[in-house]
Amino acid sequence: MTQFRTIVADPPWRYENRASRAAAENHYPTMSTDELCELSVVPEHAARDSHLYLWTTNSHLADGLKVMAAWGFEYKTSLVWVKPQMGMGNYFRGSTELVLFGTRGGLPTLRKDVRNHFTAPRRAHSRKPREFLELVVASSPGPYLELFARCSGDADCACSRCLFGWATWGDQSGGNPSQGVLETRHGRPLCGRCFQPVPKPKRGPSGVWCSAACRTAAWRERRG
């Protein structure tokens, strides 16, 4: 089993606010905090000494810390993505996004001159900027794994797999870290499309699906 020294995760956070939840689920299936904590892929694939970059929203800060601890990492600091464009918000207009940085074991960063913020414009929903990936490569050693990755498959795609050859897993990534599937800590496989436990999985060449409908939907998304 491949052990990764750097893992990036961009979970599909589920919102309690009905409007925000509907907005997210228009783009992809979401997962609850407890469901994310149950995932075994990070503890199983993280090297003894490794780094975790965990994307979270400002409203999911406490949830992000809970998930990081459940995956066996100790929170150290945060990175901030500053977006020139102003977004929505319940109290203040959002223009930032957080990345929680945690460590397992005693792995230091590669450099000591990297700032804890970066500025980059918004991309398509949930897609993260190239500037972030460059920061990760400058700060943390490989091999690299990205969970919940998104790959457009276009010639100008700027995902971690297309740019840097990372191992990826996600319903729109087309990759898998171990030729297997995401599982809960109890060994139950999760559907590669809706992330729900699958009692009788339907296996395909690029993942496991709870139904033919999910398998077809994932194929269509990859095809664009």
Identify what each model region corresponds to.
Residues 183-224:
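BZIP DNA-binding basic region
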Residues 1-184:
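Class I S-adenosyl-L-methionine-dependent methyltransferase catalytic core
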